[in-house]
Amino acid sequence: PDHACVVVHTGGTTGSPKGVMLTDNSFNAIAQQFSAYDTLFQKGQKLMNIMPPFIAYGYACGVHLPMVLGLTVVIIPNLDPAKLGSLVLKYKPEIMFGVPAHYQQLAADPKVQKKDLSFIHNYAAGGDAISLGAEKTVNEFLASHNVEYPMAKGYGMTEVASAATVAAGKNNKPGSVGIPMVNTLVSAFEPGTDKELPIGQRGELCISGPATMKGYYNKPDETAMILHKHPDGRVWVHTGDIGYIDEDGFVYLDSRIKRLIIRHDGFKVFPSMIENVVSQHPAVHQCSVVGCADKDHVQGRLPFVYIVLTRSEEHTSELQSQR
């Protein structure tokens, strides 16, 4: 059970391709952890898997997990996002795992706008961050279509077989990616160190749990860069993600360390904090914040926002006036 059963390729924390060795224990741990959340699954329900099964998220949550938990699995190969609404109406799956963009697509699909979707038990988003504005839009859509629960969310990475936290049912704070799963610890540390930070303080999110990979295939040096044994005796995965834990144990994800924008005065700007504000404007469909050169100083960068509008160019002048 502790031998590698699959090698899943990922860019990991450095961006260069590498094979993640996951074990039977890794996938079984994910299934056992999710079984503790009865608000997520109930035996006999139908799960529609729209994620590719050759990635950890798609295989662990969309193939292995439902078979272990006694769910019916409908696998959609090579999903056309434009057909997602039609597929949901055709198969009526109570459960679905996807990325935030899938649910934004579903909420905007005219084919489902006047349909009763009360058959939906839990639709979960992972694999990417979601802004507060987008989360609000999706949850308003679900509530207006008679869905009991808001969109479930989770956080993880290939190196932990896809999932480390979950926000589901009523235990779901806006903006949070949830609480650590059963037998899993998530904490914020001073980046690259084993110094744990206080509640509410931003640092590098690190994960310790039973789904952790054996390592990167034939890359011991890169394995040593991400798997660190701390003084507590636990092996922690250093994710390269910046975030914090609140007083209730909910985890909040800000951005990749590499996305952090440092101004000329050393002030750290987290792109997600700006994106969360901008995304709540009704004219904004999507936005992304990047760092650009500061022409007034020899060092440091300034945040620059790219925006996709909801309705072509009609709001451009309005947004420009609000800069």
What are the roles of these predicted feature ranges?
Residues N28-K46, F54-F97, Q105, D109, ...:
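Conserved AMP-binding/adenylation subdomain of ANL enzymes
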Residues N172-K173, I179-N183, K195-H228, F250, ...:
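Conserved ATP/PPi-binding loop(s) of AMP-dependent carboxylate-activating enzymes
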Residues P1-H9, S16, T39-K46:
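Conserved pre-ATP/AMP-binding loop-to-beta segment of ANL
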Residues E94-G98, A107-P174, L185:
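Gly/Ser/Thr-rich phosphate-binding loop
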Residues H3, K111, F119, N183, ...:
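Glycine-centered tight turns that cap/initiate beta-strands
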Residues L89, M96, G209, K214-G215, ...:
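AMP-binding/adenylate-forming catalytic core of the ANL superfamily
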Residues C5-Q32, A167:
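Conserved AMP-binding A3 loop
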Residues G19-M21, N49, L71-N78, A152:
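Short beta-strand->loop structural element characteristic of the AMP-binding/adenylate-forming
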